[in-house]
Amino acid sequence: MILPYDSIENESWNFRGPKAKVPTSKSQTKISHLDVRLKEAIQAGEICYYLQPIFDIPRQQLIAAEALIRWQRDGEIHLPSNGYLDRLKLIETRSPFFEIMADKRKSLRSMISLHCDIDLHFNLNSEFFQYLEKGYGLSQICGENPCFFDLSIIEITEETLSQKNEKELVTFLQGAKEAGCKIALDDFGSEHSNLKRFMDYDIDIIKLDKSLTCQLIQKSKARAVLRNLALMCGDLGVQIYAEGVECQDTSDALLEIGISIHQGFLHGKAIPVADFTRKIDEFQKGLWMIH
């Protein structure tokens, strides 16, 4: 059932109420219209998770999948504008949309567990962590099912680590680790990366940003940097994943420098959950081949 907008407590988000803000420009009008459509889409169940596989290439093993938000309408991905995902990141952290998406994460974890025991990666952007200051606990953000924590990886970006609520973030991450979650530093290399991250935060995985992965076959300096990064991660007990692997040459170059866990279009794009579960069955039968 679609909830009425009157149920939204934050008046700045109640576009039909008497206190609604009146846009002062065409760009603001477009944003307001997009926000309304996104809210309706969340409540109608059109905003859902797709899954992109993550493989250990030498072992030919499906080890994880990243949950990526998509707007699905009439069985197809809907792309209303280039910036809709940025708006969605803001909207999905507001009540009641926050609770709706939290339920989707819980259901997704339970559904995949019926087919296989692989890790699921969930990206929590900086907006989520405003809930830490409001007293929200780990179970309210991620779920109460113990298997969620044991087989889930929370992805945070370097940008998130730069937020002001560092104390609350550290407490949250410690609680997640104690509950069984792993922590991944996403888009590594896209912001101001530094070694202090490894000392201040108990990171289990770093995921190389596509911008680094793409340079590997073109720049010898990039290859040297990533080779030594892989060695350092090995010494620290931190796993290293490569995102944005789109061609065989890149995959081969990564393997040569010791980076064996790959995610990208070469090995599989993000697909609906129902399709992914069918692929799991095919993979277990040897029908889903890794390039």
Language-model features: where?
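Short beta-strand edge/capping elements of PAS-family sensory modules
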Residues: I63-E66, P80, L151
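Alpha-helical scaffolding segments of alpha/beta enzyme cores, especially the outer helices
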Residues: Y136-Q140, E168-E178, A224-L231, A253-E256
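PAS/PAS-like sensory domains
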Residues: A44-Y50, D117-I118
